[in-house]
Amino acid sequence: MYNAFLQRTAEAIFALGKHIQTSDRFRTAAFDDKLKCAALSPCFDPALTNRETMADSVQWRIIDHCAAVTRIYAIYEQFVHEMVREHLGLLQGILPFSQLPGAIQTSYRLGLSKILEKKDGPRYADLDLSKLVDGYGLALRGQAYSLEPRAILMQEQNLRLPELHRFMSASGIEGISAWIESHRAVRDFFQAADRLGASAEKELSELIKYRNDASHGSIDIGDILHVNVLLEFCDFILAVCEAIAERVQLAGLQALKPHGHVTERGRITESLKADTVGIGKMIGGFSKGLTVYLCGETYCLERQVVSLQLNGVDHETVRLGEGTEVGFMFDGPGKKNSIIMVIEEPSGVNAMLDAQGLEAVHA
C-alpha cells in the first residue's frame, strides 16, 4: 500500500546522508590542503580550493549542520502528512462518510470550522468556500464526497512524539507512540549503538531541538553536531518512517474490515528461506501477483505473492472453500504467526450509492 512512498522517502534520506559525508570529506580535504592533482596540468578548477571563495571551516560546518537537521525533519514531517493524506484517500474511496472512523468525522468537522474561521488568510485562500461547505453537506447526506485533507492536516506544534500521537489519533490512527517505540526497525536502531536519546521520544525531541535552534539562527561552535550524529538522525528517521507506514497501513485495513472490504484469509504457521516462504491454512482466492498484508501486533507488511503451491504443485490461481494448507513465496521477508489480510476489489462509494439507489453527486 505504502511501500513506494517509503522507498521514495528512503531515497531522500540516503541522498542527505551522502551529502553530509561528501561535504565533510571535501571540507576536511580543502582545509588540510589534501586536494592535489597528480597530473602535470590542473585536473580541476583551482578556485575550488581558494580560501578566499570558501566559507571558513567553522561557518561551513554550521551551514552543513543547519541544513542537515532542517532537511531531515522536513522529510519526516512531509512523510507523516503524506501518510495521512493517503489514509484518508483510501477510506474515502471505499466508505461512505458515515462509516469513517469517528475520530476522522469529528476532526474533519472541527477542521472545517477552523478553515472557515481563517479563510481570509493566505493559507486557505485557494479554497472555494462554497464547494467546501457543499461537499461536507454531500458527505453528511450519504452521497459521494471528497475530503479536503487540510481540514485534517492541522498540527499545533512540531511533531514530537506526543504531538504525532495526537495528530495521528485525530486521523483515526491510534497508538502510534507505543507502536514506534516497539517497532523492530526502531528497536534495531537503538540496539545497534549508543544513541543521543534513550528512546524514540527522546531522540525525536533532540532532533527537533537542534532543528528549531537551526531555524532561529542560534548556533555556535559548541552546538555543531559531529557528522556521525547527523547520520544517526538519518537512520533514526528512516526507522520511524518505516514504523509509521506500517501503522497507517494496519489502521486502514482495520477500518475497512468491519464493512467487508478487507478479509482475513488465514495465518502463517511456518516460515522458511529467511521468511520469504510462508505456509499456513488459508481460505478464499489467491493468485500470483496478488498483494497481501502480513499483520501482527507490532507490524503490517505489504507483500506480493511470487508463487504459490497446493499439495506441492505450483498454481497460478487457487480458490479455497475451506481452510487448506498453502505455501507462498513472497517478494520480501514475512513473519511466522502473521495473519494474512487482503483488500477485496472495492466497488467504491459511487458504486455503493448506485446499488442503494442513491444519487451520486460530485462536489
Each predicted region: which residue ranges?
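Short runs of predominantly hydrophobic/aromatic residues within well-ordered alpha helices
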Residues: 65-72, 76, 80, 84, ...
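Amphipathic, Lys/Arg-enriched alpha-helical patches that create a basic surface
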Residues: 5, 12, 16, 163-213, ...
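Beta-strand/loop-dominated core regions that host nucleotide or nucleotide-derived cofactor-binding catalytic loops
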Residues: 260-363
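Non-transmembrane, amphipathic alpha-helical segments
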Residues: 1-4, 8, 57-72, 192-199, ...
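Charged alpha-helical initiation segments
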Residues: 1-67, 82-87, 94-95, 100
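Charged/polar positions within long, soluble alpha-helices
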Residues: 21, 77-88, 212-220, 242-253
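Helix-loop junctions and short alpha-helical segments
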Residues: 71-72, 79-193
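Broad gene-expression machinery/nucleic-acid interaction feature
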Residues: 70, 211, 325
